[in-house]
């Protein structure tokens, strides 16, 4: 996976989790669809060039980064349109208010729909709850979802590590919500 520590600018390294996750979703999708070759996809220098391009569209705001899923959705949509890439952006917001929060099953279905198309999901976690594998106020790509007994778990890439967290526990415990975003090829 890509790493926001690759950015050369201090502000980008500090607040670049959103553009980094968006770059991974985009880069993987382009590779899968034959629009990026393996050498280009796996080269860190070229990946950083894509991260800097994505930064111009999925731009962190001072005081909080890309802390709204709508900003990820709008930025990716603009980038795809500007570059003539035939993809749709899908977004699911998780409200900070329990009464208006989507059900765990709906979030799991959204993630499943993306992964079934062989595309990672950018995940915004504004508050980690009790999930030790997550950092608060952070975007990470989800690359898999699996069951562990009755628990729905999501595999993530972050800081060069592979970790997993409980989707149900996160949705129950988060006090600030978050959301999910992926792209799919237009038909």
Description of each model-found segment:
Residues 1-74:
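Active-site-adjacent structural segments surrounding the nucleophilic cysteine of cysteine proteases
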Residues 48-186:
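Conserved active-site-adjacent core of cysteine acyl-enzyme catalytic domains
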